Amino acid sequence: MNLATNRALLKPFTQAEFPTLEAAAHPHVPAHLMPEYWQAANRHLVKKILCEFTHEKIISPQIYRQAAGINHYELRLKDCTYYFSARHYQLDHLEIEAGSIRVSSAGQDKPLDAMSLIIKLKDALGMSETLLPTYLEEITSTLYSKAYKLAHQAIPATTLAKADYQTIEAGMTEGHPVFIANNGRIGFDMQDYDQFAPESASALQLVWIAVRKDKTTFSSLEGLDHDSLLKQELGEQFTKFQQHLSALGQAADSFYFMPVHPWQWREKIARTFAGEIARGDIIYLGESQDCYQVQQSIRTFFNLSAPQKCYVKTALSILNMGFMRGLSPLYMSCTPQINAWVADLIESDSYFAEQGFVILKEIAAIGYHHRYYEEALTQDSAYKKMLSALWRESPLPHIEPQQTLMTMAALLHVDHQEQALLAALIKHSGLSAKEWVKRYLNLYLSPLLHAFFAYDLVFMPHGENLILVLDAGIPVKILMKDIGEEVAVLNGSEPLPQEVQRLAVELEEEMKLNYILLDIFDCIFRYLAPILDKQTEVSEAQFWELVADNVRDYQAQHPQLADKFAQYDLFKDSFVRTCLNRIQLNNNQQMIDLADREKNLRFAGGIDNPLAAFRQSHAFGNQKLKPKS
């Protein structure tokens, strides 16, 4: 083609023929990427880096002045020095005053920059050149997320304390309290973020597909079959989907129906499973009539249209906080059976019911087997976890009409004015802070202790995995979720049924107690104590005494477990300092190998146990029970 003689191709366009920014479906620059939000996001993340890397002994800031319980620190790096003020709490926790942080270079203060700080620390972090760029991208994405929350989530703690369940869920701003890069979401673009990030609180529709039964695993609780479940979840759409298959000349009874994350369908399934789609083994059916809201875990959905219906959890092949967030078809094959076994155990022991501890069961699961990847890959791989889903009970049937729900992550939430939701919730309840905390510990800590000591059973008890049931702000029940992937039986003395063998975990005996001391004390209570100390009348010392009281009372009620209490001593002087950020820094593609949970763990010496101070008065055999007030 001769462009010089083809005038039509050279005809200039007028400005009116070009799309304008206003006409675009999405803005080219997100509104939250403004200097004030970006600076605030960096200050927040620099504060967290200084806190958590000090806790994990990656850095060692030095005290240069002390005054009235506040220490003034400096961290000298190669070409700059960071200065900040903080209170030192138990478990080597620095509660840093965000406004006190400054960085000086060549005698001049510089803007706080989380990316710059990570790069300056890269030798101390010990990351490979291969992994570092991905980690930096995760840091940037975490800053992006924080800036969004600063711009769009200005709900005061006092308002959130009385808000509905899904408003609170979307109002959480921190994510995992320990991890620095906790909002990576590698794979989402700007528009995906607006649609699929939990903090966007978007109402969205799931994609539904039909998958051929002979290539798919479906499992469910006894007495529940695929058609019964899907008729309940889909309503009239179930019949419409069957009619659609018939119109295509397909036998409806040769297929299961499966929900898929819209991003997963667009970015992964439509391409990676193209052969299956072309052969008619996977058939697109349409979008759900019901609307859903993404939960904090980013791949779980709450049904907004019919809240009594199930949560839906789907595979989502984005990299987020050390894992590709897929779901294994192999795991789906026994997930309901594991849930049934755990629920039967919990429900058969009256102690759990007395404490108000309830399991939200995953009642059914489905997984499509991509034969090529399963044949080609012998090791665990994200490519074998792209197309699965499960259904989990809604929390609504477990509460009374006057009761409300709140993610336990909310207890660590602090609003943009540094006001804690926990303090607002306690005030709303009308209870004293001490009484509120006692009731909370009875609901949360006591059942976890009983599961550990009586059954060698552990959960993943971080805030996002638990739902508080509140009555006028008073905690009355607690709901535990994410059972199939997160529960384990540690060095169990009794053989497990074949269908739940996956729960059995063998590990060094000295590491077993870490499931209490790390997961609860270090990852939850380390943050809870300073909030109570600063914003309620419960001091840090009083909080740890309440924890010690709870342990003492539990052990006194179960003297038959005395040997276990001695073997796994909750009042011992110290425990191993397990470093979660170091684990992510070591391998941010897959932090933990589920086949060998200890292999990737990273440690940094010991850490003093706050309960050691109560050994003489509270350890089993020494207890003197306080009269109930």
From Swiss-Prot:
Keywords: ATP-binding, Ligase, Magnesium, Nucleotide-binding
Entries under InterPro entries matching the protein: Aerobactin_biosyn_IucA/IucC_N, IucA/IucC-like_C, LucA/IucC-like
Domain of life according to the entry: Bacteria
One example of a Gene Ontology biological process annotation: siderophore biosynthetic process
Involved pathway(s): Siderophore biosynthesis
EC number assigned by the record: 6.3.2.63
One Pfam family per UniProt: IucA_IucC
Transmembrane segments: none
Disulfide bonds: none
Any one Gene Ontology molecular-function term assigned to this protein's record: ATP binding
Catalytic reactions on record: 2 N-(3-carboxypropanoyl)-N-hydroxyputrescine + 2 ATP = putrebactin + 2 AMP + 2 diphosphate + 2 H(+); 2 N-(3-carboxypropanoyl)-N-hydroxyputrescine + ATP = pre-putrebactin + AMP + diphosphate + H(+); pre-putrebactin + ATP = putrebactin + AMP + diphosphate + H(+)
Class of the enzyme per the UniProt entry, highest EC level: ligase
Activity regulation information from UniProt: Requires Mg(2+) for activity.
Coiled-coil annotated residue ranges, if any: none
Subunit note: Homodimer.
Family (UniProt): Belongs to the IucA/IucC family.
Function per UniProt: Ligase involved in the biosynthesis of the siderophore putrebactin. Catalyzes the ATP-dependent head-to-tail dimerization of N-hydroxy-N-succinyl-putrescine (HSP) to give pre-putrebactin and subsequent macrocyclization of pre-putrebactin to give putrebactin.
Record-given protein name: Putrebactin synthase
Organism: Shewanella sp. (strain MR-4)
